[in-house]
A protein has these predicted regions:
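Short, charged, low-complexity loops and linkers
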Residues: 1-12, 86-92, 96
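Short, contiguous alpha-helical
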Residues: 1-2, 9, 13-28, 32-82, ...
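Helix-adjacent hinge/juxtasegments
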Residues: 71-107
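Long, charge-rich low-complexity segments
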Residues: 92-113, 189-203
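Conserved, well-structured core segments that form or line functional sites
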Residues: 117
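Low-acidity, Ser/Thr- and Arg-rich intrinsically disordered low-complexity segments
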Residues: 200-220
Length: 221
């Protein structure tokens, strides 16, 4: 954007794209097995998150504004099993889901570019009092939706292999090695154990002890 002040639509579109890329990056370097492996009691998995976000974005920027994408999404059919959009079948490869998400972006961006922010739409599955929407509202909603799921993916990926960070070129984490992080985590565990023994309200106010080499500039308090 060459340093110029962005329009409101450009700003919203930029934040949406940043959230999309942050989410998709979490699949980089993950095997087909690990991409599908359920990491929580409710089955949260990386590939399922991407499949879900790609699918709902197609709906929000498609049919809602009378601009159907033509994508076939059988996991949203009335007779589909619960949570069918939250996991990928054996026949749906990681490449398939990534390609779906890219097509979703392209279709959504055409809607965003061609409509005004006050363009009306209707979300039939929302409550009657709130289902009449504008493109502006759906953009904000989709930014929040994507960012929320990118956060889920961030934690899931860290649980899989320890990879963490906002995006490939900026982890947004203090620059320390695995030893430092192990000491840091151990210090938090000690604080948690101390807090469990502390009466409520706790009279002792303790902060985690800083591992060697930490500084106030990069500590995450």
């Amino acid at each position: 954007y060459s340093g110029r002040v962005l329009t409101e639509k450009e700003t919203l579109k930029r934040y949406l794209q940043q959230a999309r890329e942050a989410l998709l990056w979490k699949l980089d370097g993950v095997s087909e097995r690990d991409a599908r492996w359920p990491m929580t009691p409710t089955g949260t998995n990386l590939l399922g998150i991407v499949k879900h976000v790609a699918s709902v974005e197609i709906g929000y920027f498609g049919d809602i504004f009378g601009r159907p994408s033509g994508e076939r999404l059988p996991w949203f059919a009335d007779d589909a099993p619960d949570n069918a959009d939250m996991w990928a079948t054996v026949d749906e490869s990681r490449a398939d889901i990534i390609a779906l998400y890219h097509r979703s972006w392209a279709h959504s961006d055409r809607t965003i570019d061609e409509l005004t922010l006050d363009a009306p739409g209707t979300v039939p599955w929302w409550p009657p009092e709130s289902r009449d929407v504008t493109l502006h509202r759906i953009l904000v909603h989709m930014i929040a939706e994507t960012a929320r799921h990118a956060g889920h993916a961030d934690i899931v990926r860290e649980l899989i292999d320890g990879m963490a960070g906002v995006r490939a070129d900026n982890s947004n984490l203090p620059d320390h090695d695995a030893t430092w992080w192990a000491v840091y985590v151990a210090s938090l565990q000690r604080v948690a154990e101390d807090a469990a023994q502390c009466p409520s309200p706790c009279r002792r106010r303790r902060s985690p002890s800083k591992p060697n080499g930490s500084s106030s500039a990069n500590s995450r308090m």
